Amino acid sequence: MTATYFITGGFGFLGQYIVKAIHEHDPEAELRVLVRTQRKTCLQLERLERIRWMTGELTRPETFADQLKGVDSVIHNAALVSYRQSDADAIFQSNVIGTRNLLQAALAAGCRNFIFISSISATEYRPPQITDETMLPTNMERKRLNDMYGYSKVTSEMELKEVSEKMRVIILNPSVILGPGSQDVDRTARAIRLLPVLPMLQYINSFVDVRDVARAVVLALTQGRSGERYIVTGTNIRMVDFTQTVLRVMRKKAMIIPLSGAGVKLMDGLLEMLRVLRLDPGIRHLADINIDKPCSSEKIRRELGWEPSFSLEQSIRSSVYPEK
């Protein structure tokens, strides 16, 4: 029997790779991809057969609910990512209400699988411990005030877990995603090309290749326990070392200056001044960012059989020099 998949966020950075991975994984399947507007994709997905592009809004279930009839698996990747305080209401509507609407429609349509692309932001970092799936935010109100995006993701996770006995629910929590099309590496590369000196925070961060995340989605269709969350990450590395790796890949030279505590306070003061002037750049306080964030992928390796296929250097190289 031919399987049918319903995918949201298919035009995004990760979403395009998910659509491609599902298309290659199940050559006979029908893919229904919900988008807000039609546009060309860097992976040229519009040229693929067996894909139905549907226009709709997750905040308006009447625009997509009928398309869930006959769907076996829902892959929910769409989300509004922002750290601007002024976007808090929009984030809640898009990420919490939108996910709730999709979940209710999927239950009503009798869908069997619901794969939710959450985020490592839905965890709580507790250095020097390595972050794992058990580390939920201990103060949800503080999370809501300081990180509405992460709050929206963990709130949706909780609602999904409540129905995990009625429908199979798998939650994936990717770390910082790299690979062809990555804006994170692109920003670093642009700074390297322009600046001879690079101020850099000193914390440990966690990275994974976009193609490895897409493969985790494919595995989650049949592997894993309903209601469980799985961190998807490949490499833990200090940001100074990460930047040195980007320099090496680009064959560039620049002086990296680790930011001191005083430097972090100075930058946060400038950010706060911009917010007061209503010029919010959408950057979180550096003091909130500048904490070690090593993450464990032991659970997804053990239960889904997932292993990263791309090293950090391979991910950076394909981000800086994507294939044409």
Residue ranges of predicted features:
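Flexible, glycine-rich beta-alpha linker
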Residues: 123-124, 167-188
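Active-site Tyr-X1-5-Lys
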Residues: 144-170
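Glycine-rich Rossmann NAD(P)(H)-binding loop
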Residues: 8, 179, 199-203, 230-237, ...
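NAD(P)H-binding glycine-rich loop region in Rossmannoid oxidoreductase-like domains
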Residues: 51-97, 105-108
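Conserved Rossmann-fold NAD(P)-dependent oxidoreductase catalytic core, especially the SDR/UDP-sugar
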Residues: 97-148, 170
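Substrate-positioning beta->alpha
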Residues: 185-187, 199-222, 228
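Mid/C-terminal beta-alpha module of Rossmann-like enzyme folds, strongest
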Residues: 216-281, 297, 313, 317-320
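N-terminal Rossmann NAD(P)H-binding glycine-rich loop of SDR-like oxidoreductase domains
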Residues: 3-25
